């Protein structure tokens, strides 16, 4: 998961400051996840779990309230029907994964993730969901980046 995060930063870093910041948050989230998922003890470190949950909330919130809106706005500004159609297809799955992440956070806040075995099982599911989410997000960025690059090559002004 960390390797795909690095690849995303290498591919799209510098394209847009908002995306750069978001990809950095993704990397922090993955690192915190890796630290947390390495737990073998019966009880997780409460501070590590709280830190991870905060990063998770920040990341999914930035995606929904900043990045996805920006990607959609740029797709509209560039007249990128392909990108907008892709977003329309992808957003429901991203929303479902966001809901799952928020539920995980709520369970942790309620103390339902204090058991090591329970947490390990939840992290396994969350890992799969985050991996899928990152792939879907990368696909959206790729489409935007391609439209942006093609429009820039044609000499069009870049709306921001």
UniProtKB/Swiss-Prot annotation:
One of its GO terms (biological process) is alginic acid biosynthetic process. InterPro entries: Rsd/AlgQ_sf (IPR038309), Sigma70_reg_Rsd_AlgQ (IPR007448). Keywords: Activator, Alginate biosynthesis, Transcription, Transcription regulation. The promoter for a critical alginate biosynthetic gene, AlgD, encoding GDP-mannose dehydrogenase, is activated only under conditions reminiscent of the cystic fibrosis lung (i.e. under high osmolarity), and at least two regulatory genes, AlgP and AlgQ, have been implicated in this activation process. Belongs to the Rsd/AlgQ family. Transmembrane segments: none annotated. It comes from Pseudomonas aeruginosa (strain ATCC 15692 / DSM 22644 / CIP 104116 / JCM 14847 / LMG 12228 / 1C / PRS 101 / PAO1). This is Transcriptional regulatory protein AlgQ. The gene is algQ.
């Amino acid at each position: 998961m960390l390797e795909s995060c690095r690849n995303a930063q290498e591919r799209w870093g510098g394209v847009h400051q908002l995306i750069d910041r978001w990809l950095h948050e993704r990397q922090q989230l993955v690192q915190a996840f890796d630290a947390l998922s390495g737990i073998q003890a019966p009880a997780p470190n409460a501070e590590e779990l709280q830190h991870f949950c905060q990063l998770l909330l920040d990341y999914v919130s930035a995606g929904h309230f900043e990045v996805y809106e920006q990607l959609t706005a740029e797709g509209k500004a560039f007249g990128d029907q392909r990108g907008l159609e892709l977003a329309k297809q992808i957003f429901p799955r991203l929303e479902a994964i966001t809901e799952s992440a928020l539920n995980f956070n709520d369970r942790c806040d309620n103390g339902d993730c204090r058991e090591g075995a329970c947490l390990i099982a939840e992290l396994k599911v969350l890992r799969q969901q985050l991996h899928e989410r990152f792939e879907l997000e990368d696909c959206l960025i790729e489409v935007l980046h391609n439209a942006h690059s093609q429009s820039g090559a044609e000499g069009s002004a870049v709306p921001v």
